[in-house]
Amino acid sequence: MARIAGVNIPTAKRVVIALQYIHGIGPKKAEEITEKVGIPAERRVNQLTDAEVLQIRETIDRDYLVEGDLRREVSMNIKRLMDLGCYRGLRHRKQLPVRGQRTHTNARTRKGKAKPIAGKKK
């Protein structure tokens, strides 16, 4: 198994698919990386040379925010919104939907298990 950005990527899969196992790299970025390095799309990870793996690793480190750095960046952005006290920050702080979804009936995933109301039983 090749290890790129702290992730063991599967060897039997195509390079474009295997790169998507890294948090922060999707289909488009994986294709961009293979084009920059000059690897054919149908090449598999176990067919890569050590030099090609090194090129991929350097390209990702230089040009993309992945794994722990990306997670840290996202959490810092959310923390910044909460510190500002803006509407989105307040919604994050109260653990409610942030992007305008209704909460009267839905949003159970974000709000948690429904709390029973006493006195409604008959």
Curated annotation (Swiss-Prot):
Region (Disordered): 94-122
UniProt key word rRNA-binding: yes
GO MF entry, a single one: tRNA binding
Signal peptide residue numbers: none
Keywords: Ribonucleoprotein, Ribosomal protein, RNA-binding, rRNA-binding, tRNA-binding
Gene Ontology CC: cytosol; small ribosomal subunit
GO annotation terms (biological process): translation
PANTHER family linked to this entry: 30S RIBOSOMAL PROTEIN S13/40S RIBOSOMAL PROTEIN S18 (PTHR10871), SMALL RIBOSOMAL SUBUNIT PROTEIN US13M (PTHR10871:SF1)
Family from the record: Belongs to the universal ribosomal protein uS13 family.
Subunit details: Part of the 30S ribosomal subunit. Forms a loose heterodimer with protein S19. Forms two bridges to the 50S subunit in the 70S ribosome.
Function of the protein: Located at the top of the head of the 30S subunit, it contacts several helices of the 16S rRNA. In the 70S ribosome it contacts the 23S rRNA (bridge B1a) and protein L5 of the 50S subunit (bridge B1b), connecting the 2 subunits; these bridges are implicated in subunit movement. Contacts the tRNAs in the A and P-sites.
Protein name: Small ribosomal subunit protein uS13
Organism: Methylorubrum populi (strain ATCC BAA-705 / NCIMB 13946 / BJ001)
Lineage: Bacteria, Pseudomonadati, Pseudomonadota, Alphaproteobacteria, Hyphomicrobiales
